């Protein structure tokens, strides 16, 4: 069977109290809808249609890196109406997986099990259901005396007895495309919400003697939807626990998982140790045998193996093997450290490349610089890279020694094996193998009083 997926993502999400569409809110490092798309792709479906409505430009921008198609639901008239918008772009012979865009906890295994159940039973439609201890807010699955599907009753339309049912509709389905779209055209808005319910199409198909299957999943956690900020925080916590467990089982040590925050797409090599109060975000990649933390935050950075980073901040930085960073270092975007570099306490580096084995031990600012191999930058060194209008380059060639409290006024180049005297302000190029000193003469004046 040819598989397509339709993700319903047109809702406003009023309870989020936000200008953003609900599916655009971030959880575990990326927007909710990207978690759903990832699960669908991991389940083996490449043909994905997203139904957009409120904030469609934002949703489309978020998904711009994905190979998906969009259809527009101008008015939010229910789940059935949302699915109908996809009729023109889904082949009638397809089997379609339908799910909401606000369920970031969904896992590919649950979707695969649903699709396999649908295939084995050769059903026209299959509903993924879950038994929940607290089913409040969910539609209930009604079965006949033989346990077969009867219908789904939405909570607002349910009576007191029906509300006692624990088996709920997850909102995730498999359908024969041609038959579900035919049934949807016969649905109405005669219900408490005044909307076109997708669940009514199931009842119509049942009345037409079509086969309706139920796949009862044990993945209660998987189907949690996000409706407000409380649920967003709960989903964040669950996804972080999953990620931490995945990393620990793959050979990464987390000294205190409860205080460690690692985004879903982060990759970390084995025998790396993550100390407490560490945050690793975005698409960061860390090698093997590193020690990170405590109190470190790394965003969208590439870290080699055997790197030590203590109490520091890294943003879009690239760090080669065996570097030593911190404490209290700040590596800003486009910073590259080659192998064996030391960046010590209270050092800020921006848009610079630091050569193999070079050291910037403490209290320095390096911006728009290229530093060669084996360079030592003394305490208090500043690259003066900005004249109020433009940024300029500083170049330190191999084996340069910069004395403490040196100001390097860019553009400037210090030739290889050269030394600057402590306290100098260097504003002209220094030839190789040179000692450069620039100081005002020292004066001794008598004290008064």
UniProtKB/Swiss-Prot annotation:
Renumbered residue ranges of the record's region Linker: 230-250
Protein name: Bifunctional protein GlmU
Entry note: cofactor: Binds 1 Mg(2+) ion per subunit.
Record-listed acetyl-CoA binding positions: 379, 385-386, 404, 422, 439
Gene: glmU
Region ranges (Pyrophosphorylase): 1-229
Entry EC number(s): 2.7.7.23, 2.3.1.157
Residues noted as binding UDP-N-acetyl-alpha-D-glucosamine in the record, renumbered to the chain: 8-11, 22, 73, 78-79, 139, 154, 169, 227, 332, 350, 365, 376
Source organism per UniProt: Syntrophomonas wolfei subsp. wolfei (strain DSM 2245B / Goettingen)
Reported cofactor(s): Mg(2+)
């Amino acid at each position: 069977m040819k598989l397509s997926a339709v993700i319903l993502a047109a809702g406003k999400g009023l309870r989020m109290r936000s200008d953003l569409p609900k599916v655009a809110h971030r959880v575990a490092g990326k927007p909710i809808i990207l978690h759903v798309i990832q699960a669908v792709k991991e389940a083996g479906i490449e043909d994905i249609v997203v139904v957009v409505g409120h904030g469609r430009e934002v949703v489309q921008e978020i998904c711009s890196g994905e190979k998906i198609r969009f259809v527009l639901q101008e008015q939010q008239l229910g789940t059935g109406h949302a699915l109908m918008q996809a009729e023109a772009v889904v082949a009638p012979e397809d089997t379609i997986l339908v799910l909401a865009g606000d369920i970031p906890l969904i896992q590919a295994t649950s979707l695969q099990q649903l699709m396999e159940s649908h295939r084995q039973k050769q059903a026209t439609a299959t509903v993924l259901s879950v038994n929940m201890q607290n089913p409040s807010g969910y539609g209930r699955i009604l079965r006949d005396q033989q346990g077969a599907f009867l219908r789904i009753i939405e909570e607002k339309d349910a009576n007191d007895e029906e509300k006692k049912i624990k088996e709920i509709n997850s909102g995730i389905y498999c359908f024969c495309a041609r038959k579900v779209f035919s049934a949807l055209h016969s649905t109405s808005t005669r219900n408490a919400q005044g909307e076109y319910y997708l669940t009514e199409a199931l009842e119509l198909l049942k009345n037409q003697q079509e086969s309706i299957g139920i796949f009862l999943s044990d993945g209660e956690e998987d189907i949690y939807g996000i409706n407000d900020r409380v649920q967003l925080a709960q989903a964040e916590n669950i996804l972080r626990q999953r990620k931490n467990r995945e990393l620990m089982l793959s050979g990464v040590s987390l000294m205190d998982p409860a205080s460690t925050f690692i985004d879903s797409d982060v990759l970390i090599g084995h025998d790396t140790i993550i100390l407490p109060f560490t945050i690793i975000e975005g698409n960061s990649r860390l090698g093997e045998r590193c020690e990170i933390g405590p109190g470190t935050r790394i965003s969208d950075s590439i870290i080699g193996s055997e790197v030590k980073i203590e109490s520091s901040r890294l943003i879009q930085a690239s760090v080669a093997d065996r570097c030593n960073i911190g404490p209290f270092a700040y590596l800003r975007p486009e910073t590259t450290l080659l192998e064996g570099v030391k960046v010590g306490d209270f050092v800020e580096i921006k848009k610079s490349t630091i050569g193999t084995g070079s050291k910037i031990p403490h209290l320095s600012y390096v911006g728009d610089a290229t530093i060669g191999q084996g360079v030592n930058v003394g305490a208090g060194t500043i690259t003066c890279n900005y004249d109020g209008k433009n940024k300029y380059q500083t170049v330190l060639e191999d084996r340069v020694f910069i004395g403490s409290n040196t100001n390097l006024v860019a553009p400037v180049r210090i030739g290889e094996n050269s030394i600057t005297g402590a306290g100098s302000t260097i504003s002209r190029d220094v030839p190789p193998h040179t000692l450069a000193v620039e100081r005002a003469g020292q004066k001794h004046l008598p004290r008064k009083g």
